[in-house]
Amino acid sequence: KPKANTPYYSATIRIKKAKKLEAKGKIEKSKKIYNEALKYLYVANKEKPFDPDILNYLGFANRKTDNVKDAEMYYLMGLEIDPTHNGINEYLGELYVITNRIGLAKERLNVLKDCACDEYQELKDVIDGVKKSKY
């Protein structure tokens, strides 16, 4: 759990808020909040570089603001540090699905196959077309 009153904490609060707005179909409003989160995440990344959780959220918030190239870069940086990070593997897999790189998405799924985690099923459902990416 992130420490209160840190840039990372401030970013996570905004990401949760943006996800709620997105779930209600308020996409443009959610993108503004994701952009606010990014400002905090860039500061957090400067203060604590090489933190896979920060890199995961940098990838996530960039993807949510349609900046797929930067999102992929941050996800890949995070995987260099922690190749089995569940969140990064799921979200990068979803990015690969939305950019029509199913083979790469399946590679991420393969990494998650033994994790006994929600991320495996979430990504599998997105790859199989059972559901659209929740995030």
Feature annotation, model-predicted:
Residues 4, 106-135:
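Terminal, low-structured helical/coil segments at or just beyond the last alpha-helical repeat
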Residues 51, 85, 117-120:
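Residue-level recognition of tetratricopeptide repeat
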Residues 47, 81, 112-115:
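Structural marker of alpha-solenoid helical repeat scaffolds
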